[in-house]
Amino acid sequence: MKTNIQQYFLILLILFFSINVYSQDSDDIINKVKEKQKLLSDYKADIKIKVNIDFLKVPDVDAKIYYKKPDKFKIVSDGFLMLPKEGFNVSPESFFKEDITSVFVKKEKLNSFQTNVIKIIPNYDQSDLVLSTLWIDDKEFVIRKVESTFKQGGTVVLDFDYDNKYLTYGLPSKLKFTFDLKNMRLPKNFSGFDTPGKKKSDKSPSTTGEIYIIYTNYEINKGINDKIFQDK
């Protein structure tokens, strides 16, 4: 009997220390991502937005993106921007600005990159976010992928590509944004399949949409006037 109690105690002790080690791992990894972000005060860049939705024909849009620490973020374009609200703000500090609990899950190969998989849970009920899973590069400590579930907006997935030139700041060269169409309100003038002479596809339209954003001409830490972020 005494031996069994000792065995149970040993198992509990191992579990306790394992949980603490994993918790410490997740905090350390996130702090390394934040350290990289401390190098960045502001940036602006040109972006090209490509929308891929089965039943919509949306032209590519050129725009400018602005970010200023700690949380100023804006996209400016003369064209029509169809961007889902939930999860779209990918400013460097947006993933860690809330009061969160983080848990290290595992190490995983993502494409050709070794990553740390970390789950993030907000610590208050008012948050629209339910859960985020982050794939963080084990060498460069940049975010390679994020999958987030929201209370009202379903699930969104962000996939990041980086050029070596801007890797120091954790700024992407390309972003793929995948989202649930059923949770997105579409403009009335987009009725779908309304191109003259175009035959309707027999296939059921996809339930997900994709937005690709290509970043060029970064200007980093040059200073940005706060007036840029004011609504006109």
Predicted regions located by residue number:
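Gly/Pro-enriched, hydrophobic low-complexity segments
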Residues: 114-229
